[in-house]
């Protein structure tokens, strides 16, 4: 199975002020300061436009990203024929674990209610059209609207579910073509690389967008808004840690190894992901390490790349948690039925998320636009802190895909338990020695 990920190039260390993470951090601090000291300046339409403009740039690439990632992911599943029912087992595992991630994010969001009391009131004119569309929508219309009148129209409007439906059908069609579809699959992968290049260009404007979003948020809603945003970051970190330790930890224990030893074993890959905010940056290295860990090569070759479209646990947690935060901040009370809709929609939109930097925010935009378009303007609230959550999203994603490969190998009775324990114990011992020597 092929993948759109490539090994991260080795780069010489660059000046600290050229690192995107540092630039965004500085922009956020300056934005918060401007919002506190000069609220009249911070609430200027031009300052607000900086954040809104960046969000529009992100929304611009939603449709092509979903089409390319979903189509490519499904089309390449033809390799599952070589490994029996591995593909079916992997997809079953992905859906079950993804559901746990979504439910955990939803549960923590309802339990802590970190956005409650923020009382953000977005521009009424900007929201009016969304509200009108939401009120006019009926269930049967919602279902029928998933089917596009034309594919071109779906892409032109950026209708997420319509593009997703076409991507799924197109992916299965390519899979059925077999070798005849190889050239077209390659073209789609090339287009995906080009779209990721667009994202890379757009992300260079992230500091400007972060400044505008933070300055406007603090200037309009006061310094108290900072407390809620920091609270959201902390809540997401805690929720992701709970998922890794409890959910993935139980899966690891079922197979017969410690989740903590596994984390030590892939520590180098985790550091790469931490530095790039993209779980795809360490994909080739992760696959190699999983094979050396005793996992079946065909299973690793299928499960890990497929997981980058179908098993993004960190992104799933983020989507439900951020959606609830935005709804609470805007004073929108979501019923049980609406929260159930969030789960169902997120199960679909998350399949269009890639491990590329910023994809989690793109997926959030896709989810909000389907669940309740009136919440879309609220994305500006969380955009300014998205960079601080992207690292944890990426880390959780890569850990989840690593555990998935080990579990499916075990499920298929193609896991070398002796090699598994030997490698994990050796890695833990070497880390302990290194720590002691320093």
From Swiss-Prot:
- Topology in the lipid bilayer: Multi-pass membrane protein
Source domain of life: Bacteria
- Stored Pfam families: SDF (PF00375)
| InterPro entries named among the record's database cross-references | C4_dicarb_transport, Na-dicarboxylate_symporter, Na-dicarboxylate_symporter_CS, Na:dicarbo_symporter_sf
Which GO MF terms are attached to this record?
fumarate transmembrane transporter activity; malate:proton symporter activity; succinate transmembrane transporter activity
Its subcellular locations are: Cell inner membrane
User: Per UniProt, which keywords does this protein have?
Assistant: Cell inner membrane, Cell membrane, Membrane, Symport, Transmembrane, Transmembrane helix, Transport
Q: Name one GO biological process term.
A: L-aspartate transmembrane transport
* Ranges that cross the membrane: 20-42, 57-77, 90-112, 160-179, 192-214, 229-251, 324-346, 361-383
List the residue ranges forming a coiled coil, or say none: none
Q: Name one GO cellular component term.
A: plasma membrane
Q: Which HAMAP family match?
A: C4_dicarb_transport (MF_01300)
Instruction: Please give the family membership noted in the entry.
Output: Belongs to the dicarboxylate/amino acid:cation symporter (DAACS) (TC 2.A.23) family.
Q: What PANTHER family does the annotation carry?
A: AEROBIC C4-DICARBOXYLATE TRANSPORT PROTEIN, PROTON/GLUTAMATE-ASPARTATE SYMPORTER
The function of this protein is: Responsible for the transport of dicarboxylates such as succinate, fumarate, and malate from the periplasm across the membrane.
Q: What name goes with this protein? A: C4-dicarboxylate transport protein 1
